[in-house]
């Protein structure tokens, strides 16, 4: 990231014979003031593995200087009527563990093919379920909320990953540690 004020970027290009060229660029950066709008992202909440599709269809959300990604997500979910439960804080170590909204889980219908996969993978069904919330350890031992930014799964909490103008963030529910949504890392 660039610091406020003058920044120097030095680049050395080398070919396979060892010849090189050095370039130096001075970049002046004027940082936005804390709380100033710096862009817009698109946020959605996907519960396809439960047969529910989008719990929150893609919507535009303003982002502000000094605000963590977790803060922007909480603001978007709460403005859509969700109650959020999480560990850590919006500033550090944030993990979204559960979202609540009246009737959110009433029409759960886990696809049969996914049930077969979970059974063959050896995951334990917990039997936990709440018609008014969806969260960690509901249905299976490997369930919970993960997220993608611009289609790529990210490591770490939402408080620790940067976002920028134009990014797309999708919260995705998994029943199998991400294996069922393409986000599993061994």
Where are these regions (language model features)?
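Ubiquitin-like/PB1-type beta-grasp interaction modules and other compact soluble beta-rich domains
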Residues: 1-186
């Amino acid at each position: 990231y660039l610091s406020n004020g003058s920044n120097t970027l030095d680049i050395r290009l080398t070919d396979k014979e060892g010849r090189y060229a050095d370039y130096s660029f001075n970049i002046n950066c004027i940082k936005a003031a804390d709380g100033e709008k710096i862009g817009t992202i698109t946020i959605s909440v996907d519960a396809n593995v439960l047969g529910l599709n989008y719990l929150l269809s893609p919507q535009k959300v303003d982002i502000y200087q000094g605000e963590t990604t977790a803060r922007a997500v909480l603001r978007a979910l709460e403005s859509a009527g969700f109650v959020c439960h999480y560990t850590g804080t919006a500033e550090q170590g944030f993990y979204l563990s559960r979202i609540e909204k009246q009737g959110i889980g009433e029409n759960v219908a886990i696809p049969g093919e996914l049930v077969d996969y979970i059974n063959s993978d050896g995951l334990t069904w917990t039997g936990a379920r709440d018609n008014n919330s969806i969260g960690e350890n509901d249905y299976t031992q490997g369930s919970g909320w993960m997220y993608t930014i611009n289609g790529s799964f990210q490591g770490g909490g939402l408080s620790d990953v940067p976002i920028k103008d134009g990014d797309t963030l999708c919260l995705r529910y998994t029943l199998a540690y991400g294996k069922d949504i393409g986000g599993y890392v061994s």
